[in-house]
From Swiss-Prot:
Cellular component terms (Gene Ontology): virion component
Lineage, uppermost ranks: Viruses, Varidnaviria, Bamfordvirae, Nucleocytoviricota, Pokkesviricetes
Keyword Protease: no
Signal peptide feature range: none
Record-stated family: Belongs to the asfivirus H240R family.
Name of the featured protein: Penton protein H240R
UniProt keyword list: Late protein, Virion
Length: 236
């Protein structure tokens, strides 16, 4: 009788990948945040680069990062319980559920930094999945506290500029720009200081010559960058 040979065991190795979810690289037409993750060789506008495909993900780690004050908050005491929670929509099948039925992957302590920003310090910076996630291609982070979802001011605005009067016409009035804020103007590499902010117009001392009257205005104080570290199992 011929002996039956056991099938060889497939070994697995652990891979680690880091990515930075940058709000200025969110997917077009997706607000507030939604990101597409692709290997570095395929990166371009509105793509978050990773070393390779994120498959068989078993653990996710987050590090401290800054956020602007949400539109619903004015003071640090407005954060109920001094906590903020982060939930990834695509990973909803594996998440922590709190007593209110809300889901999250990470809990943060809110630490004041300035009148414009707070720092989020992870209470537990690691989330281990019960079952490996087959693939992570998109991530949509949702922030909330015990009062509900948090909405943030935009970090990029499409605006009209008048070089003759050195003013920029804002598309909305409920922005959070104020005198003294520093902004980037598309096509010009230096930070510009807002000399005066009145209604839905901001005035800058010297607006550089631009090829178009319609430009992008980048607002550094509103930018959110979420540092994540993934651990995956790969067959070898």
């Amino acid at each position: 009788m011929a002996a039956t040979r056991a099938a060889p065991k497939t070994a697995s190795k652990k891979e680690h990948q880091y990515c930075l979810l940058d709000s200025q690289e969110k997917r077009h037409g997706h607000y507030p945040f939604s990101f597409e993750l692709k290997p570095y060789g395929q990166t371009g506008a509105n793509i978050i680069g990773v070393q390779g495909s994120l498959t068989h993900v078993i653990k996710m780690t987050v590090f401290p990062f800054m956020i602007p004050f949400p539109l619903q908050k004015i003071h640090i005491d407005d954060f109920i319980g001094g906590r903020v929670y982060l939930f990834f929509k695509e990973l909803d099948v594996q998440a922590i559920s709190d007593v209110n039925g809300m889901q999250y992957h990470f809990e943060f302590k809110v630490v004041p930094v300035s009148s414009n920003q707070v720092e989020l310090l992870p209470v537990n910076n690691k989330y281990k999945f019960t079952y490996a996630i087959p693939e992570v291609q998109y991530l949509t982070p949702i922030f909330y506290d015990l009062s509900g979802p948090l909405n943030f001011p935009l970090d990029t605005l499409s605006v009209h500029v008048d070089s003759l009067t050195n003013h920029i016409q804002l598309p909305i009035q409920n922005h959070n720009l104020t005198t003294g804020d520093r902004v980037f103007i598309s096509g010009y590499k230096h930070l510009q200081t807002i000399e005066l902010c009145k209604n839905n117009k901001i005035f800058i001392k010297c607006i550089p010559p631009l090829s178009s009257e319609k430009i992008k205005l980048y607002i550094p104080k509103n930018r959110i960058r979420i540092p994540l570290y993934f651990k995956s199992l790969k067959n070898v």
